[in-house]
């Protein structure tokens, strides 16, 4: 078993000397996407789709 892994097999957030276990540059390029990034993209998509519906509902109003 690796010296860096905890008893549950996960890599700790910090090394014993206090440095981060994973460099911040690699946090953005490896592994899964951060939840806040997924939620932000999803929220923007929902607002965009709702905007399209509101735009469509007002198209033609007053043209008749």
UniProtKB/Swiss-Prot annotation:
Keyword Transmembrane helix present in the record's keywords: the answer is yes
What InterPro entries does the entry give? PSII_PsbJ, PSII_PsbJ_sf
GO annotation (BP), single = photosynthesis
Query: Topology versus the membrane, per the UniProt entry?
Result: Single-pass membrane protein
Q: Which family does it belong to?
A: Belongs to the PsbJ family.
- Judging by the UniProt lineage, the source's domain of life is Bacteria
Pfam families linked: PsbJ (PF01788)
What is its quaternary makeup? PSII is composed of 1 copy each of membrane proteins PsbA, PsbB, PsbC, PsbD, PsbE, PsbF, PsbH, PsbI, PsbJ, PsbK, PsbL, PsbM, PsbT, PsbX, PsbY, Psb30/Ycf12, peripheral proteins PsbO, CyanoQ (PsbQ), PsbU, PsbV and a large number of cofactors. It forms dimeric complexes.
Entry protein name: Photosystem II reaction center protein J
Q: Which residues form the signal peptide?
A: none
Q: Which organism is it from?
A: Prochlorococcus marinus (strain MIT 9515)
Q: Which GO terms describe its cellular component?
A: photosystem II reaction center; plasma membrane-derived thylakoid membrane
Gene3D superfamilies xref list:
6.10.250.2070
Q: What does this protein do?
A: One of the components of the core complex of photosystem II (PSII). PSII is a light-driven water:plastoquinone oxidoreductase that uses light energy to abstract electrons from H(2)O, generating O(2) and a proton gradient subsequently used for ATP formation. It consists of a core antenna complex that captures photons, and an electron transfer chain that converts photonic excitation into a charge separation.
- Localization (cell): Cellular thylakoid membrane
């Amino acid at each position: 078993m690796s010296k860096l892994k905890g008893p549950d097999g996960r890599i700790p957030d910090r090394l014993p000397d206090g440095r981060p276990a994973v460099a911040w540059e690699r946090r953005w390029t490896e592994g899964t996407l951060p939840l806040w990034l997924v939620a932000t993209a999803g929220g923007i998509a929902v607002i965009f789709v709702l905007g399209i519906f509101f735009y469509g509902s007002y198209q033609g109003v007053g043209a008749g």
